[in-house]
A protein has these predicted regions:
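N-terminal beta1-alpha1-beta2 submodule of the flavodoxin-like/Rossmannoid cofactor-binding fold
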Residues: 1-76, 80-81
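FMN-binding flavodoxin-like domain, especially the glycine-rich phosphate-binding loop
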Residues: 55-149
Length: 149
């Protein structure tokens, strides 16, 4: 089975923690049944060299915004811009199979807004969301979704 490839950016460690938990969960599922895919991940940061992706992948991105309410009075993405630039590099967007977003529900309409904007910008599905570091149920739910797709 081909591994699930994930590109992610993590600012405060929540996304990194979730991807780590997802990777561990995948190992357990694969140990139970070798047809269950493993997870391979690559962290994108401001220090990353842009590369041409060669395999389909999913993107995990948190939301950090400055000002505006995200709907009618503007939005300014903070700290995650490099991920958007990486997806847009060369033909990388062609291999993106969807976006998973995270954030804090306290921000209402801004919750997962970066992921939703990337999905629209790159014409790929917004697949799922989880809050902050996610829960075990989130890990299971998102693994099943990515493994099926």
């Amino acid at each position: 089975m081909t591994p699930i490839k994930i590109l992610f950016i993590s600012i405060e460690g929540n996304t990194r923690s979730f991807v780590k938990d997802l990777t561990k969960y995948a190992v357990g599922m694969h140990d139970q049944d070798a047809t269950n895919p493993l997870v391979e991940s690559k962290e994108i940061s401001d220090q990353s060299d842009f590369e041409n992706e060669t395999q389909p992948y999913f993107v995990f991105v948190p939301t950090y915004l400055d000002g505006g309410n995200g709907i009618d009075n503007g939005v300014k993405e903070l700290m995650t811009n490099t991920m958007g630039e990486y997806i847009g590099y060369e033909h990388n967007a062609d291999l993106c199979h969807g976006i998973v977003g995270s954030g804090n529900r306290n921000f209402n309409e801004q919750y997962c807004l970066t992921a939703k904007r990337y999905a629209s910008r790159f014409n790929v599905p917004f697949l799922a969301d989880y809050e902050l570091r996610g829960t075990g149920r989130d890990v299971e739910r998102i693994y099943k979704l990515l493994a099926a797709g």
